[in-house]
Amino acid sequence: MISIEQADKIKELVALIRKADEERINFALSGIEEFEAKVNNAVEALDMFLDEIIDHNTRV
């Protein structure tokens, strides 16, 4: 049988684990959003570069 003090410690540990899990999820989601933004910026830069090539080749 566990004591009240042990039960309180277990409750604290469970709360800390839940908080850590929530922070992990938030970090993962923000990391995904940051990665998506970088990919979108790279695609946009590539699109602009290709437009410049097309413009240059149509003028020649």
UniProtKB/Swiss-Prot annotation:
InterPro entries per the record?
A: DUF7438
The species is Enterobacteria phage T4 (Bacteriophage T4)
Superkingdom is Viruses
Q: What is the lineage of its organism?
A: Viruses, Duplodnaviria, Heunggongvirae, Uroviricota, Caudoviricetes
According to UniProt, the name of this protein is Uncharacterized 6.8 kDa protein in mobD-ri intergenic region
